[in-house]
A protein has these predicted regions:
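Conserved PLP-binding catalytic core of the aspartate aminotransferase-like
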Residues: 365-366, 379-418, 443
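Conserved core of the PLP fold type I
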Residues: 98-248, 260-290, 454, 468, ...
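N-terminal small-domain helix-loop-helix segment of the aminotransferase-like
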Residues: 31-140, 200, 348-350, 462-463
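Eukaryotic N-terminal targeting leaders
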Residues: 1-39, 196-198, 465-477
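PLP-dependent aminotransferase class I/II
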Residues: 295-388
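Helix C-cap/helix->beta junction micro-motif
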Residues: 248-249, 379, 419, 463
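PLP-dependent enzyme catalytic core of the Aspartate aminotransferase-like
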Residues: 111, 119, 129, 291-292, ...
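Hydrophobic residues in well-ordered beta-strands that form the structural core
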Residues: 161, 183, 255, 423-425
């Protein structure tokens, strides 16, 4: 088990060296650590981590720092925080802290909070009854993913995830559990997924063949809907077909609905032409209820839909009694503060407020999304039409010099150093095409987002002018 963890960390550290061309200076001071610790000390959480903190320290301000940076690379939704903050402040002043808060409760989360969460999920996300006894609560989505992977899979097992996918899945499933990520490639060009994810049973069969040929067990399939980074939504028909395949082959299917309420209004007049079909989000919970299988599970968290990543609340929903029992016995180090659970219990059971909040947040998300895709259309930059999440997946491959990870990172760095706009680099998402980037659009104000799009436009136009001049020069020589 330890050997698999060490191997997984070593692969990540070597990959970081390949991508950045250097190791952290901290490598010289890790002799006091275990081999695992030394590798972790030299292996950043994500490749854009340092750049993000640099950008935040030099953040744009219209008057105080008009040439400052605009970080659009971390998945945070700040558009509706002012509304939520006012509500939370009213709870803390008007409600009396419950007697259960200062003591120990269930390691899967207090029953009071799980009841509130089940009520919220049933009313707003799943649209079918959620049993609080089948919920487990941990300190954030990362903890839920770590715990689930640790319990369901052994070190060296494979978890297939359709590419492109959230890069930090590798750490979430691998750092402690030793589970290895398999990038399930279903397409190359972004145009191939303009109507949504392209996953089929044939893709799963191909993945199983490759995984087993490598001497591994295909143990988990992880789907995110709405997807990160493409914003695509899996239809219920696709989810049902995939679920049947997974049950037959004893592969655990986990559907991550982290962005399930962060939906785009595809009828908005500025974007409606992008959508040929009206594909609505439907929760995987209804399929779980119908099939009642120990191989089907759902992840959720309050981080994105409510914009409270710092509160650290993630949820597992499953009909697998053994999984939930194991979770209870292992979750001590991942539990959520009782005070946080108490506070959010009151928030999630205020039906009028939450209904209004979700609707207004979706309206703001749609307006911000329209700003980004409006700019992309004017610039003739290809992108995947999003139906949900906090992202736009864009194609800047026309500006690539070469077709390597180094060239990918060079373009990302050039955009940031030239314009101050920091996107999420495509390196690490597992797809085959280079030159793709993720734009996080609700992490800044609408004014700041407009400035970022203006700067992106200036960068694109300057690059095209230089490319045109270079082409003309080549023709004359």
């Amino acid at each position: 088990f330890v050997r698999h963890i060490h191997s997984n960390l070593k692969k990540r550290a070597d990959l970081f060296t390949l991508r950045s061309g250097r190791r952290s200076l901290r490598a010289m001071t890790t002799s006091s650590l275990s081999s695992r610790g030394a590798l972790a000390a030299n292996n950043p959480l994500r490749i854009d981590h340092a750049a993000y903190h640099e950008a935040v320290a030099n953040a744009y301000h219209p008057t105080e720092n008009p040439t400052g940076a605009l970080p659009l690379n971390v998945a945070e939704n700040r558009l509706s925080w002012s509304d939520l903050r006012a509500k939370i402040e009213s709870i803390t002043t008007e409600e009396t802290i419950a007697a259960w808060v200062p003591g120990y409760t269930s390691m899967r989360g207090s029953l009071e909070f799980r009841r509130a969460a089940a009520h919220f999920l049933t009313r707003h996300l799943t649209r079918c009854p959620v049993d609080p006894e089948q919920l487990a609560v941990s300190a954030g989505a990362t903890s839920v993913i770590e715990m689930t992977s640790f319990i369901l899979a052994d070190a060296g097992d494979a978890a297939a995830i359709p590419a492109p996918c959230y890069p930090v899945y590798s750490q979430d499933i691998g750092s402690f559990s030793g589970v290895e990520r398999y990038d399930l490639v279903t397409h190359h060009e972004v145009s191939e997924i303009s109507d949504g994810p392209a996953l089929t049973v044939s893709h799963l069969e191909h993945a199983r063949t490759e995984i087993e040929a490598a001497g591994q067990r295909f143990r988990m399939l992880i789907l995110t809907t709405p997807d990160n980074p493409t914003g695509g939504i899996y239809s219920l028909d696709t989810l049902s077909e995939v679920a049947d395949w997974c049950i037959t082959h004893e592969v655990h299917l986990v559907v991550n609905e982290l962005y399930g309420l962060s939906l785009i209004d595809t009828r908005h007049p500025e974007i409606e032409a992008d959508y040929a079909d009206d594909v609505a989000f439907n929760s995987f919970a209804s399929i779980m209820a119908d099939k009642q299988s120990e191989y089907l599970h759902l992840w959720y968290a309050l981080s994105k839909d409510l914009g409270i990543s710092g509160f650290r609340v993630g949820l597992l929903y499953s009909h697998n009694a053994a999984l939930l029992e194991a979770y209870e016995n292992l979750n001590l180090s991942h539990t959520v503060s009782n005070h946080t659970q108490w506070l959010l219990q009151h928030l999630l059971t205020d039906d009028d407020f939450m209904t209004s909040y979700v609707a207004e947040n979706q309206r703001r998300l749609t307006e911000a999304y329209a700003v980004v895709v409006g700019a992309l259309k004017r610039l003739d930059i290809p992108y995947v039409p999003s139906r949900g999440s906090l992202f736009v997946w864009i194609d800047l491959s026309e500006f690539m010099v070469g077709d390597s990870e180094q060239a990918d990172l060079a373009l990302w760095q050039e955009l940031y150093r030239t314009s101050g706009v920091l996107l999420t680099p495509g390196v690490g998402f597992g797809h085959t095409k280079k030159g793709l980037f993720r734009v996080v659009y609700p992490c800044v104000s609408m004014e700041e987002l407009s400035v970022a799009m203006e700067r992106l436009g200036a960068f694109v136009q300057a690059k095209r002018q230089r490319q045109g001049s270079s082409t003309s020069g080549d023709a004359r020589s």
